[in-house]
Design a protein with these regions (language model features):
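An N-terminal assembly and electron-transfer interface module characteristic of large anaerobic redox
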Residues: 1-362
């Protein structure tokens, strides 16, 4: 099998390392680009959300690189993500692509089906080899998330933001040529060392902004037009409310009870939203309140057009903003989103928060 998977931020790094440790040939999709989105938009139903369209673009670009198997997680609940594999398989079939799609559905969708699909990936490896590969993959997920947050912190204080750009660009370029989880971990360690050596201005007192909303648009830089970088260039310290590590700890490592961190967000959201609405709608509301309690200066909700769970959360956040006296901005993205207008809104929001801080200090 030549396995590929859709992009979701840095998840592809851990997925690549895990599959290579199991002896598979991995076809990493090209980094998401305008071309990826155009391909996906061309063949996807018009009203499907942007992540769906980017996924289709990822698949087609990977198939053209030689991939014959697609690995994707499933879902359940009101979010349409759970229907992705079915619809996407039909689209690829109609386009004449003969590929096998392996879906890791939630345990609640059927343990036998999940076991069958997992066994396809495990490649008849021994329990010891599987444990070792899984442990390395988990370490990769955590370390890539930590590296991403470190780059956000350094960028907010850096004397020259380009220094951070060069280090991170070099890191992503080297990933394609690096094989195996252990080598990828070494690359991450060296990149961390380089970031910590970037000259910083300790006198900067950056604004702190939380990024909340739909998980794909939070995590995938192309989908959110590199919002972390844009805010960092404005001397803003950014933190994401959802990362692959947070998702994994809540839905897998702490199953079926959930992680303490995410359950706390559910508790905070209860006064506004008692029941889950699909996706991460309830977490979005809870995260806004959580960031307020931690002394953040504001939050930005980001979601793809037509995302049902986040539309519900968006309507509630207006009340949260008023009740908590806490700046909240919502950004909706799709294939028509223009970067100039997007950046203008970010700059205006940051100016607003800066004036608010100055007024409080004064």
């Amino acid at each position: 099998m030549k396995i590929t998977f859709p992009h979701l931020g840095n998840v592809y790094i851990a997925c690549k390392g895990f599959l290579e440790e199991l002896g598979h040939e991995v076809v990493t999709p090209p980094i998401c680009s305008r071309k990826t989105l155009e391909i996906g938009s061309k063949y996807s139903p018009e009203m499907m959300c942007m992540p769906f369209k980017i996924f289709i673009g990822n698949y087609i670009e990977s198939i053209e690189k030689g991939a014959d198997t697609i690995l994707i997680t499933g879902s359940c609940g009101p979010c349409r993500f759970g229907l992705y594999p079915i619809i996407q398989a039909d689209i690829l079939k109609r386009l004449g692509y003969d590929v096998d799609i392996i879906v890791f559905d939630a345990i609640g969708e059927g343990i036998d089906k999940l076991r069958t699909n997992v066994n396809k990936i495990l490649n008849s490896k021994s329990s010891q080899e599987i444990y070792r590969s899984s442990k390395l993959a988990l370490s990769l997920i955590r370390r890539t998330d930590d590296l991403s947050q470190l780059s956000n912190e350094v960028r907010a204080y850096a004397l020259n933001k380009i220094d951070v750009d060069k280090i991170m660009n070099n890191y992503y370029l080297n990933i394609e040529q690096t094989h195996g989880a252990e080598e990828l971990l070494k690359l991450i360690k060296n990149t961390e060392i380089d970031l910590r050596e970037v000259p910083i201005d300790k006198n900067i007192n950056p604004l702190k902004i939380g990024i909340i909303g739909e998980i794909y648009t939070i995590i995938e830089p192309f989908a959110n037009l590199e919002i972390e970088k844009k805010l960092g260039d404005l001397n803003v310290l950014v933190e994401k409310s959802l990362t692959p590590t947070i998702w994994l700890e809540h839905h897998v490592l702490s199953y079926p009870f959930g992680s303490k961190h995410e359950n706390m967000k559910h508790k905070l959201a209860e006064q506004y939203l008692k029941n889950p609405v699909g996706g991460h709608g309830r977490e979005t509301v809870g995260s806004a309140i959580y960031y307020k309690s931690r002394g953040f200066d504001g939050v930005i909700q980001i979601l793809p057009l037509n995302c049902m769970p986040e539309i519900v959360a968006k309507s509630i956040l207006k009340t949260v903003e008023k009740d908590e006296d806490f700046p909240i901005m919502t950004l909706v993205v799709d294939e028509m989103t223009g970067e100039a207008g997007y950046l203008t809104r970010l700059e205006a929001f940051i100016d607003l928060i800066n004036k608010r801080r100055e007024k409080c200090i004064g």
